[in-house]
């Protein structure tokens, strides 16, 4: 009744799904707990471990062609291996909602967060703590042209798991602190490359290689050899210091929303990242919309490192926790996934945002709060 009253209609994604989309787009924490087997036709299939991917595939297969925004909700069983304990089950009921095709991303993000917040309040839960983040903050820094391509690829692979990204940055800081600088004049070409923006180094080295003569290249072009040599050199070298510092600082932000956004702007200014500054400025509208939709921004914390362990998120993410300090305090979570529909069979990217919650965990909290 709650979802219908907000304009969301029911969908029923299948329980049995192809395993590949889940293996490709979920984080290791969920992938390692999936129930996967091979059907008689030789296809790898699974019991759905969550509902967003099946709903996105359903939308791509049969609803997208209708055009326009589409709001839907679901309630159904999902399956993840676990050692049964309080708040953790191998089969549990997941309820949630997805909003596909909303042209105004900020408005759609806040609509879905407010929908989740209101749903939990409708159950009788009042001590709710909202945390938000934005995966795009990190993507903006990784796209910076000062970052060497080899490091861009390496950090992009690590970024969905922020603990892994943190380790990469810590190891880089240790290398920079313990590795002496190369003696001046050690390599004229190396010095020249150091003074050249990362985006222009391929062309510079390829020009140098063309003076050697094609008989030394075999079947590869000077450009291919240049890229390979640069990848090796960049992988051994440090991360661009301004970007490394900005990434490390972002991972440390855990502040009330207004203070957190001010901190992100400061990080952007220090790093000289116009892209990150623009993203932080774009959050001002979300803050205003939160207040309009009944979620007090003063009670929201900004935690950019909150990727939720799921790899399909592309921007805004959020979690709502109860007031306990337990490991199972999270009641629901969600976020934006603008490229998921295309990756599961859609003909083009579709802006989308949604959330889900485990009903058993909510019922457990309600029982604990009952007089």
Question: What are these language model-derived features?
Answer:
Residues 91-96, 132-140:
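Short, conserved phosphate-binding/catalytic loop or strand-edge motifs used
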Residues 19-20, 136-137, 158:
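Short secondary-structure capping/turn micro-motifs that flank functional sites
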Residues 25-29, 144-146, 316-318:
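Short low-complexity, flexible loop/linker segments enriched in glycine and/or proline
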Residues 2-6, 17-20, 52-65, 69-126, ...:
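Positively charged, Gly/Ser-enriched RNA/tRNA-binding surfaces
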Residues 33-41, 146-181, 322-324:
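Acidic, His- and aromatic-enriched active-site or binding-groove loops in soluble protein domains
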Residues 11, 15-45, 88:
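Polyanion/phosphate-binding surface patch
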Residues 13-15, 129-136:
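Acidic carboxylate-rich catalytic motifs and surrounding loops in phosphoryl-/glycosyl-chemistry enzymes
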């Amino acid at each position: 009744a709650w979802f219908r009253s907000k304009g969301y209609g029911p969908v029923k994604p299948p329980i049995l799904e192809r395993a590949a989309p889940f293996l490709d787009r979920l984080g290791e924490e969920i992938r390692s707990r999936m129930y996967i087997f091979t059907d008689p036709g030789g296809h790898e299939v699974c019991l759905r471990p969550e509902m967003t991917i099946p709903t996105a595939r359903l939308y791509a297969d049969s609803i997208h062609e209708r055009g326009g925004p589409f709001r839907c909700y679901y309630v159904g069983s999902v399956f993840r291996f676990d050692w049964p304990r309080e708040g953790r089950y191998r089969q549990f009921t997941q309820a949630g909602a997805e909003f596909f095709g909303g042209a105004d991303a900020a408005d759609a993000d806040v609509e879905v967060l407010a929908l989740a917040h209101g749903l939990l309040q409708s159950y009788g839960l009042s001590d709710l703590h909202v945390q938000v983040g934005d995966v795009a903050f990190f993507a903006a820094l990784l796209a910076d042209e000062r970052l060497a391509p080899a490091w861009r690829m390496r950090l992009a692979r690590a970024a969905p798991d922020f603990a892994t990204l943190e380790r990469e940055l810590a190891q880089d800081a240790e290398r920079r602190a313990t590795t002496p600088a190369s003696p001046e004049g050690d390599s004229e070409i190396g010095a020249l490359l150091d003074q050249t923006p990362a985006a222009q180094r391929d062309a510079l080295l390829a020009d140098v290689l063309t003076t050697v003569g094609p008989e030394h290249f075999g079947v590869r072009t000077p450009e291919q050899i240049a890229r390979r040599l640069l990848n090796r050199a960049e992988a051994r070298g440090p991360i661009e210091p301004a970007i490394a510092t900005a990434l490390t600082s972002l991972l440390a932000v855990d502040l009330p929303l207004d203070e957190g956004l001010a901190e992100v702007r400061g990080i952007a200014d220090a790093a000289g990242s116009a892209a990150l500054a623009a993203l932080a400025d774009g959050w001002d509208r979300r803050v205003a919309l939160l207040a309009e939709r009944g979620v007090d921004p003063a009670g929201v914390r900004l935690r950019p490192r909150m990727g939720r362990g799921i790899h399909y998120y592309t921007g805004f993410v959020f979690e709502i926790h109860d007031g306990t300090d337990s490991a199972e305090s999270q009641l629901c979570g969600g976020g934006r996934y603008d490229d998921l529909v295309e990756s599961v069979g859609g003909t083009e990217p579709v802006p989308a945002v949604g959330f889900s919650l485990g009903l058993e965990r909510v019922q457990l909290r309600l029982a604990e709060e009952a007089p």
